[in-house]
Amino acid sequence: MTENQDLCGSAQSESAENPRPSGAESDESGSEDTACAQAARSGEPSGAVSDDEQAACRLVDGCVRFDQGEPHRIVERVALEVPVSISFNGIYYNVLSCTPCDFEDIAYGVAYSAGFITSADDVRSVEVTQLTNAYQIDVILKTRGGFDYSSFMLSSISGVPIRDAEVRLPSYFPAHMVHIGPMSPIPPQAITAASNGLLERQGMHRRTGATHAAAFVDREGAFRFMSEDIGRHNAVDKLIGRLVRNRVDPLSGFAFLSSRCALELVNKLARYGIGVVATVSAPTSAVIDFALEANVTLCAFSRGNRFTVYTHPERIAIDCDGADDDEKRPVREV
């Protein structure tokens, strides 16, 4: 009996007949694994299942789905969630709960977001060790004079960065230190293309419904890189790590996130120098305030052929001359 076979006698598998919002992929893997892995990393859709994606999922037998009032026994594919410990130069940094794939990307991304590196050249090596029920990532960084990595240890209880066990570091990169270079406006069609194409490219989400995605999209709306993880922060860190490793110009496109428009996520992307961030869901006042000060163009509710620009609309190639008076007014507190 295949994993897509209904155990009560009918083929009611979610991946076969009732796909999650982003569709379903074939579970046939083999010679296409390498091509699929490359396609997944570049954001291209694929019918094959990569080795990374296979390792990041598990089959659960004995599930019961109620459909049209009728119960059906099925086998479901679920996303793996494992603890991953990261250390830098032999010093413990943090334990992440994440999807067990793309370890080098998340190592580079975390190092960049934490301010430990400014380019891929600052990393000497990344070693991944699989433990019984966890993973260990040991990152060796090229030393920078006067920089004390041990002062950036994380509290094992709260995960909040602390220095000398007393003075807390800022939880995000200060807006006044963000530098966004000049860039030509992004065509609005590129953002709607990303919105309409994201779910099609989320391989793990299509099979589990449990992952977030972070993508880097070019000015024509083509996906260049995409990362998935059960955690939205992990997905963004993996994307940043991939951009760092590939030395991608942050002004050559924009970031598109499947998650809520959270301050910490936009902050990490702005630190890399990305000037336009689009998300499928709502922003908060805090992220709007940060984006205004940091000179980041913030687009939210990016769904289908619609999106709302909250800050710095000059980076989107739109003409507001024909908009209603109410639409021309800047957003203000009431």
Question: What positions do the PLM features span?
Answer:
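Noncatalytic linker/hinge segments flanking ATPase motor cores
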Residues: 125-129, 135-137, 167-169, 178-182, ...
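Intrinsically disordered, low-complexity regions enriched in acidic/Ser/Thr/Pro/Gln residues
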Residues: 2, 8, 36, 43, ...
